[in-house]
Amino acid sequence: KNFDLSFQMTGQFGFKILNEPRAYYENNSIAYNRLKSVQKAPYGGQYTLSTAQKQTFVSYYLEDGDFLKMTNITLGYNIPLKSSKFVKNIRAYVSADNLFCITGYDGLDPEMSNGDIWSLGIDWRDKYPSTRSFTFGLNVSF
């Protein structure tokens, strides 16, 4: 009876993302820090270390970017008060941001961008994932 719930979801559908971190770390021309998935190379199964960087254009690293995110959810409780001269209302709440993301994308976050409008649809490496945060609060009205 005294509870309230609000949530916000965001999503995008029908687009592709270039998974640049996978393309970089699965590159068989570098000898360091390679992913095990390099064994599934898109270049005809060449698993050996090569000194020449492959300049072939392939769609191997294009992935479906569809996602649905729980951007925010808040659950609150209005604490019933007996008549008080000073306090009119007290509400306690808990809130979560970026609680979950439903996606088939292999990267960190299908919504990531480096802020450059010319590189939309490219997930650049060396990015931090979106933070997940939890907030507990108390609203008091006088």
Report each predicted region and the residues it spans.
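Hydrophobic, lipid-facing positions within transmembrane beta-strands of outer-membrane proteins
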Residues: 1, 70-75, 132-138
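Repeated loop/turn-to-beta-strand initiation elements of outer-membrane beta-barrel proteins
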Residues: 2-5, 82-83
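Glycine-centered flexibility motif
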Residues: 3, 14, 76, 121-122, ...
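Transmembrane beta-strands of outer-membrane beta-barrel proteins
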Residues: 5-7, 90-94, 136
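Short helix/loop capping segments that flank catalytic or ligand/cofactor-binding pockets
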Residues: 6-8, 15-17, 103
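Extracytoplasmic gating/loop element in the C-terminal half of outer-membrane beta-barrel translocons
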Residues: 12-91, 95-99
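C-terminal beta-signal and terminal closure region of outer-membrane beta-barrel proteins
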Residues: 52-55, 103-142
